[in-house]
Curated annotation (Swiss-Prot):
Homotetramer and homodimer (in equilibrium). This is Glycerol kinase. ATP binds at residues 12-14, 266, 309, 313, 410. It is an enzyme of class 2 (transferase). It catalyses: glycerol + ATP = sn-glycerol 3-phosphate + ADP + H(+). The keyword ATP-binding applies.
Length: 499
């Protein structure tokens, strides 16, 4: 009877369950979307109970549709949308408020207030993060401040906090395991990434009682077992956890110092493994934990691109220039160049290394000869220029020149983007055979803990290259194109409309 690892990939818009065999191949996928809540402009929330039921349903569907018995599952790995925050009553098991999603800006005032009091550097020094609504700490404070009776309950030890991984493990284990892993803890603004402990000073600044917080564990160990009635009569070890971007890094077998992966999703996320050294960034990158394994912690530098694949969605849904995303490859390839057109997709500001929340999208270099093909090509190229921006910041901070870039996410299917990416960063771009690297990373972490795979070398050997894109552009052309991009970004930042 063949054995498997089941990976739960709990994302921002859907929950998925994916089955992996010993070879790291996908044997089945089930997916369910859930509702997004937008109570006020800039706020994004989820119903944590709906997330839980969506996870239960995709697991059941996955096993049923693939005729798999629960006793064929050796372990469960969990990867999750990071930073999204749940606070629940440990006695009733019910959340006291919606989950506040990583995208939500409702805690901006808390962040501004802490900055005005001069605490930004304190948070940065201990957590490697910016004082921004993106991260979990201010979300917890907001819930305690705004839900009647919550603060008193928290101080009495009746409330629990967790990122989505914690919430799912607590539910799957029958309320016995209140834990998280290093990668998720490192995204909370409450965890000291050097001491590897919840930080008392930061908790005091946020006014969050320590007893609410989960125990922090490695990314690969047995945290507990499923209770039989949640998993079809079986007690299966829950054995691997990582936030989505760190899971993708692990799934890409980026185990060595200097290994880099870039995910082209709605936004873009680049992570560089910096080994056992936490590199402090001077270039607008985040310092975070890559994974905790075998008693050691590996750190990472992370860069965020706010608009990546969503720029292609905009061509389709906003401008109606295309009917489907794959068409962009054909259009972009019909012309030799953009003829000097640059598109800066700063629809929600600019991320790394600019961190300019007020910048807005812009198009430069239009002429009477500009056609749809030039416009589409400029949009695709913008993904690659932004990636170079982040890569240069990483090389500067780490002192490591990136030799090759491993890629995943929806846009990697586009050969034009991949080739232009290789050209503009002047390094090879490696597209793997299995592109579900986030779920695969969580599966690998769980599989290592239960002995399904032997060690990192065993995993490294299973990473398979589908296509390698090598740079073909000469240095003069590369320099000219990238210089034009930098001018376009600068002009975008200068243009500001008054309220």
């Amino acid at each position: 009877m063949e054995k498997y690892i089941l990976s739960i990939d709990q994302g921002t818009t859907s929950s998925r369950a994916i089955l992996f065999n010993k070879e790291g191949e996908i044997k089945g996928v089930s997916q369910r979307e859930f509702k997004q809540h937008f109570p006020h402009p800039g706020w994004v929330e989820h119903d944590a109970n709906e997330i839980w039921t969506s996870v239960l349903s995709v697991m059941a569907e996955l096993l049923n549709e693939n005729n798999i018995n629960a006793n064929q599952i050796e372990g469960i790995g969990i990867t999750n949308q990071r930073e999204t925050t749940v606070v629940w009553d440990k006695n009733t098991g019910r959340p006291i408020y919606h989950a506040i999603v990583w995208q939500s800006r409702q805690t901006q005032d808390i962040c501004t207030n802490l900055k005005e009091q001069g605490y930004e550097e304190t948070f940065r020094e201990k957590t490697g993060l910016l004082l921004d609504p993106y991260f979990a700490g201010t979300k917890v404070k907001w819930i305690l401040d705004h839900v009647e009776g919550a603060r008193e309950k928290a101080e009495n030890g009746d409330l629990l906090f967790g990122t989505i991984d914690s919430w799912l493990v607590w539910k799957l284990s029958g309320r016995t395991a209140h834990i998280t892993d290093y990668t998720n803890a490192s995204r909370t603004l409450m965890f000291n990434i050097y001491d590897l402990k919840w930080d008392d000073e930061l908790l005091e600044l946020l006014n969050i009682p320590k007893q609410m917080l989960p125990e922090v564990k490695e990314s690969s160990e047995i945290y507990g077992k499923t209770i039989d009635y949640h998993f079809f009569g079986q007690e299966v070890p829950i054995a691997g956890i990582a936030g989505d971007q760190q899971a993708a890094l692990f799934g890409q077998a980026c185990f060595d110092r200097g290994d880099v992966k870039n995910t082209y999703g709605t936004g873009g996320f680049m992570l560089m493994n910096t080994g056992e050294e936490a590199v402090k960034s001077e270039s607008g990158l985040l310092t975070t934990i890559a994974y905790g394994l075998d008693g050691k912690v590996n750190y990472a530098l992370e860069g965020s691109i706010f608009v990546s694949g969503s720029a292609i969605q905009w061509l389709r849904d906003g401008l109606r220039m295309i009917n489907s995303a794959p068409q962009t490859e054909n259009y972009a390839s019909r012309v030799e160049s953009t003829e000097g057109v640059y598109m800066v997709p700063a629809f929600v500001g600019l991320g790394t290394p600019y961190w300019d929340s007020e910048a807005r999208g812009a198009i430069f270099g239009l002429s009477r000869g500009t056609e749809k093909e030039h416009f589409i090509r400029a949009t695709l190229e913008s993904l690659c220029y932004q990636t170079r921006d982040v890569m240069e910041a990483m090389s500067k901070d780490s002192g490591i020149e990136v030799q090759n870039l491993r890629v995943d996410g929806g846009a990697v299917k586009n050969n034009f983007i991949m080739q232009f990416q290789a050209d503009i960063v002047n390094s090879s771009v490696e597209r793997p055979e299995i592109q579900e690297t986030t779920a695969l990373g969580a599966a690998y972490l769980a599989g290592l803990a239960v002995g399904f795979w032997d060690d990192k070398e065993d995993i490294r050997e299973r990473w398979k290259l589908q296509t390698e894109f090598k740079p073909e552009m000469d240095e003069d052309q590369r320099h000219k194109l990238y210089s034009g991009w930098k001018k376009a970004v600068k002009a975008t930042q200068v243009f500001k409309l008054e309220d």
